[in-house]
Amino acid sequence: YHKLRCAISMSLEVSIATYPMFESQFVANVAEAMVKAEEQAIISGSGSGQPKGITKETVVTGQNIDIAAATTALAYTDLVKAEAALPQAYDADAVWCMSKKTFFEQIVGMVDDKKQPVARVNYGLSGKPVYSLFGREVVLVGDYLPSFTASVTADTIFAFIFNFKD
């Protein structure tokens, strides 16, 4: 069990002579910093003094897809293997997680053997982009995962499929 703690101190002058705008912005900044710390821990926490992150868990045999170190681009078959490795019990609510750079440079524009795109960028009801890969939502987590590069080193995790309800 881990707690995220944020210790804040204010001088007497600040606590007495402060503006409401300053107070609300201060609270928003603290909340954003805490959310980022939680996201970092969920994805790549070391497990020592913080939660063990998704990328630090021991992968079940057969659920890790290795990409050759000399690979300059992801292949359609790599993505298909990753989808196939996901146990069916997790299929309904699982999402792809990767950096925006990996998604746009490696996957957008990729087509299957019928020349149909495997990734889509749609604009939702709010006008914000909605990303998908094989019909599965893509969550961009670029601040917490490295992007795929042609010189990717061994054991570098640049994308994963996960059910965040777990």
Which residues does each predicted region cover?
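Structured, hydrophobic secondary-structure cores that serve as assembly/anchoring elements
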Residues: 1-166
